[in-house]
Regions:
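Surface-exposed loop and membrane-interface regions of Gram-negative outer-membrane beta-barrel proteins
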Residues: 1, 7-56, 68-76, 121-125, ...
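Low-complexity, flexible helical/coil segments
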Residues: 2, 6-7, 11, 53, ...
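Short, solvent-exposed loop/turn segments at secondary-structure junctions
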Residues: 21-24, 66, 108, 249
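Short, Lys/Arg-enriched charge-dense amphipathic segments
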Residues: 37-44, 81-87, 97-101, 181, ...
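Signature for the C-terminal beta-barrel architecture of outer-membrane proteins
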Residues: 54-59, 77-256
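Small/polar (Gly/Ser/Thr/Ala-rich) solvent-exposed segments
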Residues: 62
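C-terminal structural cap/anchor segments
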Residues: 240-282
Length: 282
């Protein structure tokens, strides 16, 4: 993978242009490679970020990548060989106390080509976005909502609340809408102390699909996700930390095919706690 990321800052404006060439070599014809591994020379970011009055309030326009919160729903992958990019706008405001709100209105960029033969051959095709796939969101962060109020452990509490909306249309999906509402709270690790993270997410939506025989089916989407982590960091030079984790994500019930219950990770990373899982096809 070869990546070039250039930025230029002038008078409250930040121009950014990033290109990347991600290829494969020596893969077998029956390999599991896809657009998550290969994306021949393409533009990942081409944006301008404007300061609106001050750097505490900004507006980003163009193509960009982003990380939000735990990165479970929106992320710029670290281990995966290709990125998630969006065409649109991102508005961010940070208050003097550190509280932040971000609003985005985008069209997710589809990595092309998608067919396996082209991926294995490292074929080139411009990535593109479409009005048939739209992604919106609002994300709020409170870095220390209880600072100075508890006089102890929970002064370090950090909370997040957010809502995302994904709408899609295609040849087989006449209309699909998924709303994602989530809350997250954490106390980050420090030597000699316990830490924790808890996140809960609800998804609700509906879809209309066109079957191969021309029939139209309608169903709803109802999914949930929950995460809990409790850890302890020892006050030793090695920074030893032990932790207990629970992950839960709903799945489809084969008895009710008209209802989609599999949790949709949107544009997040998969099992990032375990490193480069893409090596194993996870």
């Amino acid at each position: 993978r070869t990546r070039i990321d250039a930025r230029y800052k002038e008078n409250g404006r930040v121009w950014q242009f990033e290109v990347m060439d991600a290829r494969q070599q020596l893969a077998d014809a029956d390999g599991i490679l896809g657009t998550g591994d290969v994306n021949a020379l393409d533009i990942q970011q081409a944006s301008v970020k404007l300061a609106l009055g001050s750097e505490a309030t900004t507006l980003k326009l163009g193509r960009f990548t982003s990380d939000y919160g735990s990165r479970r729903l929106v992320a710029r992958p670290i281990y995966r060989n290709t990125f998630n990019a969006f065409d649109g706008l991102e508005f961010t405001h940070t208050a003097p106390n550190g509280n932040q709100v971000a609003v985005l209105a985008t069209q997710p960029v589809q990595r092309l080509p998608t067919d396996k033969a082209s991926v294995l051959d490292n074929d080139f095709e411009w990535d593109k976005s479409s009005n048939n796939r739209r992604f919106y969101g609002i994300f709020t962060t409170q870095p220390a909502p209880l600072a100075g109020k508890t006089g102890g452990y929970f002064d370090r509490l950090r909370t997040e609340a957010y809502y995302f909306s994904l709408r899609e249309k295609s040849d087989t999906i006449l209309d699909s809408s998924i709303g994602t509402l989530g809350l997250r709270a954490e106390v980050r690790a420090q030597p000699g102390q316990f830490d924790f993270e808890v996140e809960g997410i609800l998804q609700r939506g509906d879809n209309t699909r066109l079957a191969a025989d021309g029939s139209v089916s309608r169903g709803d989407h109802r999914a949930e996700y929950a995460f809990f982590e409790l850890g302890y960091s020892f006050a030793v030079p090695s920074r030893l930390r032990v932790l207990f984790e629970i992950d839960y994500g709903s799945g489809n019930d084969l008895g009710t095919p008209q209802r989609q219950e599999r949790f949709n990770q949107l544009f997040g990373v998969t099992a990032f706690a375990y490193g480069p899982t893409g090596f194993y096809g996870v």
